[in-house]
């Protein structure tokens, strides 16, 4: 009796201390990034698996994600409070948008922004789930059998152990049978638990995830109701899995060394962890889809909360206007567009229309590539999070395709030009599909000679913008140093440049978009500022002037 009482006290103390630590955990303040340093390959694991399973349709491919440096954008937008939310933020940015889900999520974000009490309640509920094991919850949803087939022997061995101990006072020979049985049980436990070592953390997060869901269902706000109703129904179905997960993860006993020690002695006889794994395996077989649906919903609530938090710190933002009138051309228009990672950047007004592309010229370091990335990032943010870093935005395209960062593919033995040509051919096929898209190119075909570079760039641009057949609905922007293209494409492209001034040899980059081609050159000035020999700079300047004069005489640029 005394031992039973002492064991109960120890268990109660362990549960209380664990609960106290949870309550003391302070969540991140509203309006601040999560500052989470989890490797991106871990964060993206769930999305990559769902993509491989055909559960999501990808809108932003790997090339575009890298070109737009979206890992950094994701970190800047990551005001999520849970691992599941962080994973869902990544999926929301990369997957083809669901307009109904986007509208519902944006409505919740606006409600959170408008009501401080709702913001605090949602944050408090989400803060239950924060463990690193949450990043691997998706692995539980894909697991077919935990611990292997030998685990099915665990219940029979437990019953045999209990029976042998019960008859041992009357039949001492039972101890001789129990000892080898316990040794076999120890091996079975070690084998079974060793196969699921990486899943103990995810199991430990099932209970916090369900607690977060339950607290969200208790919040009475109309904007949260669509989520709360589904979370409540799914949570009720997962109660048995929650109990099993606590057993598997030893949620209570691991919080206290003494309680844990007592548990290990009992576990040696009753094989508690092996039986828990068996029950968990069967529960997951029945409820994996339910668990995934609940995690997706919880993640979307966290994304909505994060979007509200991000909006509160952006210097300017807007919800984009979508769609065109019948017969109107596809259009992308931003007023004062910026970048979420550049709060003090120079805003610009940009308009692109199908059938009329944009040639962006300018000196080195003037911001051409950055402006292309700004356009691409804002289309992604507008289509996925219903948020653009601009004063106003009109979007009739929701797909971005890029060819910005140029590198050799050394592993595949592909030159710069070959690797780039593969991308361009793929983009041409996408353009021919007549799906409204924004194509962004930076220094097209830089890996080949000037004559073929200019000729190929002209042909590709004409095809994408629709000048060749009049049927393409794509929006196209090309950053280039080849001013010859401004003359060759004058009938279907408008030319712009980013403002640069030079005073007493000092280059001042204004980053403001201006109509017309760039006339200022900064490459030689930069060489001089970096300390290149004066005779080298002078010789280069003389040759550049000679080449310009020759181009003028032959009608070039």
Name each model-derived stretch.
Residues 188, 307, 314-557:
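ATPase nucleotide-binding head domains, primarily ABC-like/P-loop NTPase cores
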């Amino acid at each position: 009796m005394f031992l039973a009482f002492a064991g109960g006290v120890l268990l109660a103390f362990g549960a209380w201390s664990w609960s106290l630590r949870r309550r003391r955990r302070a969540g991140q303040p509203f309006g601040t990034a999560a500052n989470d340093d989890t490797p991106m390959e871990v964060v993206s694991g769930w999305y990559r698996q769902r993509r491989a399973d055909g559960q999501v349709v990808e809108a932003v491919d790997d090339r575009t994600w890298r070109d737009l440096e979206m890992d950094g954008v994701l970190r800047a937008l990551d005001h999520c409070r849970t691992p599941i939310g962080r994973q869902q933020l990544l999926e929301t940015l990369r997957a083809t948008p669901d307009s109904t889900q986007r509208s519902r999520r944006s409505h919740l974000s606006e409600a959170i922004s408008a009501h401080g009490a709702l913001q605090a309640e949602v944050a408090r509920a989400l803060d239950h789930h924060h463990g690193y094991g949450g990043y691997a919850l998706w692995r539980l949803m894909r697991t077919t059998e935990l611990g292997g087939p030998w685990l099915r022997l665990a219940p029979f061995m437990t019953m045999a152990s209990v029976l042998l101990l019960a008859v041992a006072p009357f039949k001492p020979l039972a101890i001789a049978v129990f000892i080898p049985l316990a040794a076999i049980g120890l091996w079975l436990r070690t084998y079974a638990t060793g196969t699921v070592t990486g899943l103990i953390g995810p199991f430990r997060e099932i209970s916090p995830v369900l607690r977060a869901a339950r607290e969200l269902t208790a919040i009475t706000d109309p904007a949260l109701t669509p989520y709360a109703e589904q979370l409540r129904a799914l949570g009720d179905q997962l109660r048995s899995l929650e109990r099993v997960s606590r057993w598997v993860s030893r949620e209570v006993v691991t919080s206290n060394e003494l309680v844990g020690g007592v548990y290990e002695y009992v576990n040696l006889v009753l094989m508690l962890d092996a039986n828990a794994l068996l029950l968990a395996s069967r529960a997951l077989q029945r409820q994996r889809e339910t668990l995934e649906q609940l995690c997706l919903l919880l993640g979307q609530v966290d994304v909505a909360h994060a979007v509200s938090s991000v909006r509160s710190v952006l210097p300017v933002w807007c919800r984009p206007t979508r769609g065109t009138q019948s017969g109107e051309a596809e259009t992308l228009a931003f007023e004062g567009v910026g970048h979420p990672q550049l709060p003090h950047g120079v805003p610009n007004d940009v308009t692109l229309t199908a059938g009329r592309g944009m040639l962006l010229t300018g000196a080195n370091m003037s911001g051409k590539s950055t402006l292309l990335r700004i356009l691409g990032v804002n289309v992604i943010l507008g289509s996925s999070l219903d948020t653009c870093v601009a004063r106003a935005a009109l979007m009739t395209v929701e797909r971005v395709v890029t060819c910005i960062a140029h590198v050799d593919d050394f592993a595949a033995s592909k030159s710069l030009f070959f690797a780039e040509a593969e991308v361009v051919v793929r983009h041409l096929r996408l353009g021919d599909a007549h799906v409204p898209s924004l194509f962004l190119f930076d220094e097209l075909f830089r890996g080949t000679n000037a004559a073929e570079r200019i000729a190929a760039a002209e042909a590709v641009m004409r095809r994408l913008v629709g000048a060749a057949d009049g049927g393409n609905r794509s929006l196209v922007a090309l950053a280039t140093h080849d001013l010859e293209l401004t003359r060759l494409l004058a009938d279907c492209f408008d030319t712009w440049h980013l403002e640069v001034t030079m005073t007493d040899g000092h280059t001042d980059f204004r980053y403001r978009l201006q109509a017309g081609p760039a006339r200022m050159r900064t490459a030689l000035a930069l060489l001089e500022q970096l300390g290149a020999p004066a005779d080298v700079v002078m010789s280069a300047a003389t040759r550049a002037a000679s080449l310009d004069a020759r181009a003028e005489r032959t009608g070039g640029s």
